Amino acid sequence: MNKCALCGSEAKLELSHILPKFFFRYLKKSSPTGNIRSTSNPNRIIQDGEKVPFLCGECEDLFSRWETSFANNIFYPYEKGEKSQFSYNSDLSKFLASLSFRCLKLAYTQDRLENIDENQVPYVSKALDNLANYLLGNNPHPKEQRQFLVLLDTAESHSGYVGGIKESEFNLYATRAIEYDVVANDIAIFIYIKFLKFLVLCPVYIQSQKGWRSCRVNHRGGILKPSSIELNDYVLHRMINGARKAINSRESISGRQSDIIKKNLNEQQPEKLANSPIAQAILKSKA
Ligand SMILES: [Zn+2]
């Protein structure tokens, strides 16, 4: 018996996905090779996300209701290009807060916050409290831990480069990568969750509201659409770094693995390749 990470009750914990399974399932289904590779060890094919004993059955059910609402109303329609404007209700803020909570709590309990100063750690525990109380319904509002959602698409630059990275490579990252991180610098700590064409941000501590106004999700509901956005330099930096890491990791794939990838690609029907979001990301870019 262990303690549930959200409600704290002693229970037999379920093996929970830190990021929902349908992200990975969709990535795999829409990938021409039908496989997913993890960035940290690109030679190992991963089919699923990270799973840890985390939540009790009740909290798992709570999260899965918001997950289903997001999957059906926003995720699939946007990924498939069927819709780009969405009216949402309170489920969206809850779902995003549940993602932020899972990522921050895991980083906190597994000591993955090595980039955070000791005197900044109290901000992390306070943010976890705010998120948990909001998710459990003890607070109607997540307080400082409001959720931000950016709808991503392929970027088109005049130079063919984005932040020093080939536009096609950047677009591949922007539309396909799945990763999460707790980012810290002198003026901000925030949760960064990137999955396919979505970027979720949640401030843990920010010195100023600058760059944190657009893309804010209202906890009651509202309209979501791709629009001109103002993002902080440190958020854009994190994206560029993520894209760079993905390129390096692809380059480090061993010869044998790269033969397997080529073989899988060769066996695919050309239409499936051209219609896959990866191919479209590359075709649409000028690089
Ligand atoms: Zn629980």
Task: List where the protein language model places each region.
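C-terminal, charged low-complexity interaction regions
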Residues: 119-287
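An N-terminal structural lobe/cap that precedes and organizes the functional/catalytic core
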Residues: 1-70
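Flexible coil/linker segments and helix-coil junctions enriched in charged and small residues
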Residues: 32-35, 116-121
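Catalytic cores of phosphodiester-bond-cleaving enzymes
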Residues: 43-114
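Glycine-rich loops and low-complexity Gly/Arg-rich segments
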Residues: 39-40, 80-82, 225-227
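A general structural signal for short secondary-structure junctions and capping/turn motifs
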Residues: 5, 11, 45-48, 86, ...
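Short C-terminal domain-edge/linker segments immediately following a structured domain
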Residues: 36, 85-90, 230-236
